[in-house]
């Protein structure tokens, strides 16, 4: 029994010299570990004479409880001391204003700036217009008749003002430009547009950039060169590009522009629906009626136009699969790209 008292005294002596949690762990292992002193004492209980065994077992358990208590107290003491040292080293002056959170540009902003920079470098000017637009500029002057489905309330946001709506594209900026300027015209029109769409790849509000060139020499080959050059600079690689015949009321002939899938490199994936191609733009030669509506003499001038969705290009550029992520105001989403 005297041996048990000596073990307790030894433990107290060791604890008095412990100065770190690492040293404490070594003491804990020595006395309470699976091969520690107290564990060995419990293993030897069967060697104790039967008349002393009960008392021996009781004393060993009391020793174990006391050891656990002493070690726990020492641990709390060391943690408190460690915290005090840390606080001393990290003293904070509460009178100093907190550091400002540093923001970063939104992927849409980055994509839009990238598009504008490329076209400025190609000699295009930037024109802007109102988001609440006259129905005449949004539809009529663009050769979109009254019976066209795009004018239905299921697709367009009309406002409580006769003859006005939330623009469905930035094409009205082209109309406004042709009404106030004489050819030659070479502009892009970036901005927000609104349509009644709401699914993983569409949003009721999104960003568009449209381009317009009007002069004496504009032709389809010229337009094709401009678009191919833009896509090459935007994606920083010489992608396969194809033009598919399409229909738009304001252009004739019209085409859809596809690029080789940037995700699977035309091997076929879910994003390109296993076709190897991704639609990125629409384009065409400006319909003569649109030019005439703006007072431009079609005997001397012709033009071409094109348009693209900024979110669509941003999703391809950054590998984003849900358009709604752009509008959730989550800084973690924004910061992962920059």
From Swiss-Prot:
Its cofactor is Mg(2+). It is an enzyme of class 6 (ligase). GO terms for molecular function: ATP binding; magnesium ion binding; phenylalanine-tRNA ligase activity; tRNA binding. Binds 2 magnesium ions per tetramer. It is found in: Cytoplasm. Keywords: Aminoacyl-tRNA synthetase, ATP-binding, Cytoplasm, Ligase, Magnesium, Metal-binding, Nucleotide-binding, Protein biosynthesis. Gene3D superfamilies: Bira Bifunctional Protein, Domain 2 (3.30.930.10). It catalyses: tRNA(Phe) + L-phenylalanine + ATP = L-phenylalanyl-tRNA(Phe) + AMP + diphosphate + H(+). GO terms for biological process: phenylalanyl-tRNA aminoacylation. Mg(2+) binds at residue 252. InterPro entries: aa-tRNA-synth_II, aa-tRNA-synth_II/BPL/LPL, Phe-tRNA-synth_IIc_asu, Phe-tRNA_ligase_II_N, Phe_tRNA_ligase_alpha1_bac, Phenylalanyl-tRNA_Synthase, tRNA-bd_arm. GO terms for cellular component: cytoplasm. Its EC number is 6.1.1.20. PANTHER family: PHENYLALANINE--TRNA LIGASE, MITOCHONDRIAL, PHENYLALANYL-TRNA SYNTHETASE. Belongs to the class-II aminoacyl-tRNA synthetase family. Phe-tRNA synthetase alpha subunit type 1 subfamily. Tetramer of two alpha and two beta subunits. This is Phenylalanine--tRNA ligase alpha subunit. It comes from Aquifex aeolicus (strain VF5). The gene is pheS.
């Amino acid at each position: 029994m005297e041996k048990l008292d000596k073990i307790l005294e030894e433990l107290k002596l060791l604890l008095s010299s412990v100065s770190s949690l690492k040293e404490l762990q070594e003491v804990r292992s020595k006395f309470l570990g699976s091969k520690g002193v107290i564990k060995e004492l419990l293993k030897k209980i069967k060697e104790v004479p039967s008349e002393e065994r009960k008392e021996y077992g009781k004393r060993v358990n009391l020793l174990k409880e006391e050891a656990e208590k002493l070690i726990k107290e020492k641990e709390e003491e060391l943690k408190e001391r460690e915290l005090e040292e840390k606080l001393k080293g990290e003293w904070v002056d509460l009178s100093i204003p907190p550091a400002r959170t540093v923001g970063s540009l939104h992927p849409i902003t980055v994509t839009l700036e990238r598009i504008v920079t490329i076209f400025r470098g190609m000699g295009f000017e930037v024109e802007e217009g109102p988001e609440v637009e006259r129905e005449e500029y949004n539809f009529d002057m663009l050769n979109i008749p009254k019976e066209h489905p795009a004018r239905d309330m299921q697709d367009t946001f009309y406002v409580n003002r006769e003859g006005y709506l939330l623009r469905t594209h930035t094409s009205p900026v082209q109309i406004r430009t042709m009404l106030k300027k004489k050819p030659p015209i070479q502009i892009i029109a970036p901005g927000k547009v609104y349509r009644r769409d709401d699914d993983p790849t569409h949003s009721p509000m999104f960003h568009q950039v449209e381009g317009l060139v009007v002069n004496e020499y504009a032709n389809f080959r010229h337009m094709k060169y401009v678009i191919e050059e833009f896509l090459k600079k935007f994606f920083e690689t010489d992608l396969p590009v194809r033009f598919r015949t399409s229909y738009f009321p304001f252009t004739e002939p019209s085409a859809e522009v596809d690029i080789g899938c940037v995700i699977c490199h035309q091997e076929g994936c879910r994003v390109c629906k296993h076709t190897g191609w991704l639609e990125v733009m629409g384009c065409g030669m400006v319909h003569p009626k649109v030019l005439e509506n703006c007072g431009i003499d079609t005997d001397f001038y012709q033009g071409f136009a094109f348009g693209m969705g900024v979110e669509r290009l941003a999703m391809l550029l950054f590998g984003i699969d849900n358009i709604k992520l752009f509008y959730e105001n989550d800084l973690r989403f924004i910061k992962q790209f920059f």
